[in-house]
Amino acid sequence: MEEEDPTASNVITNSNSSSMRNLSPAMNTPVVSLESRINRLINANQSQSPSPSSLSRSIYSDRFIPSRSGSNFALFDLSPSPSKDGKEDGAGSYATLLRAAMFGPETPEKRDITGFSSSRNIFRFKTETHRSLNSFSPFGVDDDSPGVSHSGPVKAPRKVPRSPYKVLDAPALQDDFYLNLVDWSAQNVLAVGLGNCVYLWNACSSKVTKLCDLGAEDSVCSVGWALRGTHLAVGTSTGKVQIWDASRCKRTRTMEGHRLRVGALAWGSSVLSSGSRDKSILQRDIRCQEDHVSKLAGHKSEVCGLKWSYDNRELASGGNDNRLFVWNQHSTQPVLKYSEHTAAVKAIAWSPHVHGLLASGGGTADRCIRFWNTTTNTHLSSIDTCSQVCNLAWSKNVNELVSTHGYSQNQIIVWKYPTMSKIATLTGHTYRVLYLAVSPDGQTIVTGAGDETLRFWNVFPSPKSQNTDSEIGSSFFGRTTIR
């Protein structure tokens, strides 16, 4: 006995249940136009249907059928597929005819839900594979793509404000590549050398204090805060180094030893290093009465960059001889020598995250940032920045660093390490950005240039929350004068 079409039985059951309800005569009237269309389609496909008796029954309806012409029935897998069992052909044919009667003779074409079409497979090397509905991503991102986390939505890149939140006028800020005239203390006080004077700007109160005046015969060439931020070292054009108590605005000591200007200063735990145009580096122990305890010789030209490592065991120095040297605590000769740069090396920065990781930047003829492993004495990588590298500083909160540049864009670039992808490029200075310092909370940088301005930028996130605003300066938006 031939199996009856289950779909037709459902329709008949529907019409019988409708006739037993107390409905108006108008609603029990057969839908003639729909019946006629189905009968015509049945007659045209008589040879394909094995159960014409089940399809010739009158069909009644007790509801309005909505138009679904815009629906993609391929998503519901309603399109007929070849069947091995001939008894299922009747149901498939009936479904085809019913869909054609309700939505027109052209059924929506079944498509690959991934959006891939074989006609578009031109110059593509990746093989497209069928994906089930379970793997379809509602966010427009392939869940199987490399680097996509299945634990949650993809995290948006961190946004860095493209404008400084504060600008200070800094009259007489020198446009000299070999000087270091800006430093930020652990007590949140900014020191700036302007001409023959040093000024202190308190970031919490915005109060400006004149620390010292060297007189007409001398000028400030470098400033550097001690680690605790209570004392400031000042390098002068006459080769002297002065130590000032910032809280009392009182000079506590003057040390000699250099014959020419002192353009670079770096504090260790109890050692102050000074680099000079006379090509030498003097190590000064402030606990001793002597002006210096040792002299480091090796550079063939002016020393313009000095930085102690975070563990105070290694000192990196850069000079106008295009050389980068690394010294230990007790050596008078460099233990490591690097000559890959082709211009003056002023920009030097030790990583606070990886022991022995050193970054250096070259001048106009070089334009490269290079990375070194001083533990294994290896050159790790380099990147051409396409402009003079004036300064480098690592973030202590995240594995990023910032560089400041000269000709031709005078830009500031925030980099992601180790990929060295650019997080942000900041512009605004009209002269090369020669000076850079980082706030004690590690979120803000200040940059200085020959355009006689100091600009404050929020570039690094907080170690606890990337959305937390910097504690300093966020409410002091505007432009003022530092003296």
From Swiss-Prot:
It comes from the Eukaryota. The keyword Repeat applies. It is found in: Nucleus. Residues 7-28 have a biased composition (Polar residues). GO terms for cellular component: nucleus. One of its GO terms (molecular function) is ubiquitin-protein transferase activator activity. Pathway: Protein modification; protein ubiquitination. PROSITE patterns: WD_REPEATS_1, WD_REPEATS_2, WD_REPEATS_REGION. One of its GO terms (biological process) is multidimensional cell growth. Disruption phenotype: Reduced endoreduplication and reduced expansion in trichomes and other leaf cells. Longer roots. Root meristem contains more dividing cells with a delayed onset of endoreduplication. The keyword Cell cycle applies. Coiled coil: none annotated. Residues 1-28 are annotated as: Disordered. Pfam families: WD40_CDC20-Fz (PF24807). Keywords: Cell cycle, Cell division, Mitosis, Nucleus, Repeat, Ubl conjugation pathway, WD repeat. Belongs to the WD repeat CDC20/Fizzy family. FZR2 controls the induction of early rounds of endoreduplication while the remaining rounds may be mediated by FZR1 and FZR3. FZR1 and FZR2 are functional homologs, and their functional divergence in root development arises from the different expression patterns. Activator protein that regulates the ubiquitin ligase activity and substrate specificity of the anaphase promoting complex/cyclosome (APC/C). Necessary and sufficient for endoreduplication and correct cell expansion. Controls meristem size by stimulating endoreduplication in the elongation zone. Associates with the APC/C complex. Interacts with CDC20-1, CDC20-2, CYCA1-1, CYCA1-2, CYCA3-4, CYCB1-1 and CYCB1-2. Binds to GIG1 and PYM. This is Protein FIZZY-RELATED 2. It comes from Arabidopsis thaliana (Mouse-ear cress).
